[in-house]
């Protein structure tokens, strides 16, 4: 709960409307009080990603940020997508990078400028499974009142949890002592 409050406080400024982030925080507290229904890792990851979206950092989860190729729909994913991690999430671009663009490009565009340092660009991407992408899409567009109303198998959770945490920390441009403490309790 302290980590969630710290993250919300970091993203809220006096000049902005803080009603959505704090409504999200209240919904998280309610979900935590009913934690028998949802695992803590799911609540944490969903909160991290949803906090980013309500604060104006909606990730591009519908297509590749490099070539614009639209991803397969959640309702009918193609076979290649189900059997492998076809897309990667770029923290620098705040969105997906398809397998073809990731493999073909010697340097991913970083904020519209090509980088000569390929290792640097690729270090800021992470592979996404279909389940993680589906969960991220749901959380990003769901109303605040329903942001945890989905299921994700524990074996599929690592991509989603890592994406949400890394995205929030990347946008915050800092770590949180309360997150370190939370991780020490595991």
Please describe what each predicted stretch is.
Residues 1-186:
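Non-catalytic alpha-helical scaffolds and adjoining flexible linkers that form interface surfaces
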